Each structure stands twice: as structure tokens, then as C-alpha cells.
Amino acid sequence: EFRRVLFRSTLNVKKMAVKLAKIYGEDEERAALAALLHDSAKEISKDEMREILRAYPQYAEGGEERPAPVWHGVCAAILARTQWGVTDEAVLSAIACHTAGKPGMTRLDKILYLADMTSAERDWPGVEKLRKLEKKNLDAAMLAALKQTNDFVLSQGKPLDPMSKAAYEDI
């Protein structure tokens, strides 16, 4: 059941990413590829993700020092680069930062981050407002999305990823 839900979610993220790419003049194929691969490490165990982060420290972006919920994005980017032949740095960046963001996010980074937060199956208070905003102003939507994510993480009593905080301050 988890795989079916994950697959459906991935297709919804792809659809939203392509829609946003059209709006903002980003390459639709790059957006689609990033979306299709963004959660490809989601089913990997924490121990396996830790091994991947340790094996490729040059791509680990802070690795295991960061909160575990962001590891799957970084690991997905590492696997895309090392196992699946993806060489497009923009696609790899978007995959790696789709959970927490980072300072200096590109348009593609923002598109994937927002597509993941607002894809069709998402149903959280404020998602409709963010869906409208992301079609009008990418940076304003990104700021609202990062605030939503950061507030949610803090409300759960969990540590805030330093990259997420830096991304928010950067926009």
C-alpha cells in the first residue's frame, strides 16, 4: 500500500512541477525528471541512508548532522548521480533540497519544493492558499511554504534543519 501511495504522490508531484515549470519558463523535462526521482530513496532504511551519506560525503550536504527526515532527498540525489546516470546539476540540486530547501535556491529547486508541498493528494490547512500563491509569485509562495514547514517542525518539538532556516532567511 505504501508503494502505491508513494507512486501516486510522485505522479502528482510531477504533474504539479510541470505545471509550475510552464508558468515560470523552466524546462519541463528537467522539472519532470526531478519530480519523478525526488522520493526515490523514501523506502530506504535510516541505516542504508546513513551508509550512502558516508560513502559520498562530497554530495551529502551536511549528511547525518542534519535531521533524518531530510536524508531521503539528499540520498535520492546521490543515487540519481551515482547509480542512474543523472548528470544535470540543476535536477540533482532540486532533488537534494526538496524537503528542507537551501540558501540560493534556483527556480527549479523552488518548483520541486512547492510541487511536493502542494501536489493533488496534499490536504493540510492552508494548502489551497499556497496553490493559488505559487501560480502568481514563486518567491512569495516559497517564503510561505518554508514558514509553514518550519512552523510545523517546531510545533512537533523536532529540530529545525539549518538549511531550511537559512533558505527562509535567504528569500
Regions found by a protein language model. Give the residues of each.
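Divalent metal-dependent catalytic cores for phosphoryl transfer on phosphate-bearing substrates
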Residues: 18-144
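C-terminal beta-signal and terminal closure region of outer-membrane beta-barrel proteins
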Residues: 145-149
